[in-house]
A protein has these predicted regions:
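Short helix-initiation/N-cap motifs at beta->coil->alpha
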Residues: 11-32, 43
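Short, small-residue-biased leader/transition segments that mark boundaries at the very start
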Residues: 1-3
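Short beta-strand->loop
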Residues: 16, 54-67
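A bilobed periplasmic-binding-protein/Venus flytrap-type ligand-binding module shared by bacterial periplasmic
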Residues: 68-85, 99
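A ligand-binding cleft/hinge motif common to bilobed small-molecule-binding domains
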Residues: 35-54
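Conserved C-terminal helix/tail region of periplasmic/extracytoplasmic solute-binding proteins
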Residues: 160-251
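Secondary-structure end/capping motifs
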Residues: 82-186
Length: 251
């Protein structure tokens, strides 16, 4: 959000007021004028356009095509205590991703997600492909990449880029020991085992470099230089972040 603001000569600290509100509340706040806009994915942006309360300025694919979305996270002590369950859970998510990637299942998934327990909105507002907000044509191109070569594989380079952005806006000091931290939190080995057991052939797949709309190349080998070359950033610090030893799971 802050990076996209900067690309349009908007200083996110000076020119706008950013606040966090629940996704389900965003449309109501936009309708009554409590906010001027919001940054969110489907179905809330599509619904605003369909109901005439707003319009998308830019989509996420225009900002960072192929960007990471949701993650499956687990506490380290639990993962150590139950390694087989951790792998089985990862396999289940991979199989679910493969199911969601098939357009033949999109109508079923829209019906499921429309339930009050989940999104609580009309199924036709829940899309899985790239379409015009004013037309109901069947999408030929998926918007969300649920499954495919390297799509689900954890990427430490992407984790590292996110760390640089948190430091860029002074949310955290940039960790001097970022390699150690990424090795602890990005469980590539668990994914590799799960993928291998499912017969997937993308265990060793390597993603291409991170390419954002601003055209500034991200050098994962020198994140500090990357931060320093950004035209606007807050004063950031670099510090050793103690990570400690994995704690034992309480019995």
């Amino acid at each position: 959000m802050c990076s996209s603001d900067l690309s349009n000569a908007i200083d996110p600290d000076r020119d706008v007021h950013l606040q966090t509100i629940p996704p389900a509340q965003m449309l109501a706040d936009l309708k009554d004028g409590s906010i001027d806009g919001y940054c969110i994915g489907d179905p809330w942006n599509f619904r605003a356009a369909r109901e005439g309360h707003g319009f998308p300025i830019a989509g996420d694919l225009e900002i960072w095509s192929g960007h990471p979305g949701k993650v499956l996270g687990a506490r380290e002590d639990w993962a150590i205590a139950y390694p087989n369950t951790h792998i089985a859970l990862t396999k289940a998510v991979l199989e679910a991703c493969r199911y969601c990637a098939d357009p033949a299942h999109w109508d079923e998934l829209s019906q499921l997600l429309s339930d009050r327990r989940y999104l609580g909105m009309k199924p036709e507002l829940i899309r899985f492909g790239v379409t015009d907000a004013n037309h109901d044509t069947s999408p030929a191109e998926p918007h969300t990449l649920f499954f495919g070569p390297g799509v689900n594989r954890p990427s430490r380079s992407e984790h590292l880029w996110i760390l640089t952005q948190l430091a860029r806006w002074s949310e955290i000091p940039f960790p001097r020991n970022y390699v150690e931290i990424l090795e602890r939190i990005c469980a590539v080995g668990v994914y590799s085992t799960a993928a291998r057991e499912l017969g997937l052939d993308d265990v060793t797949y390597q993603r291409s470099g991170i390419e954002l709309f601003d055209g500034v190349p991200f050098n994962a080998d020198d994140p500090i230089s990357y931060l320093n070359q950004l035209s606007i950033h807050k004063d950031f610090s670099v510090a050793e972040i103690p990570v400690g030893v994995p704690r034992a799971l309480a019995s």
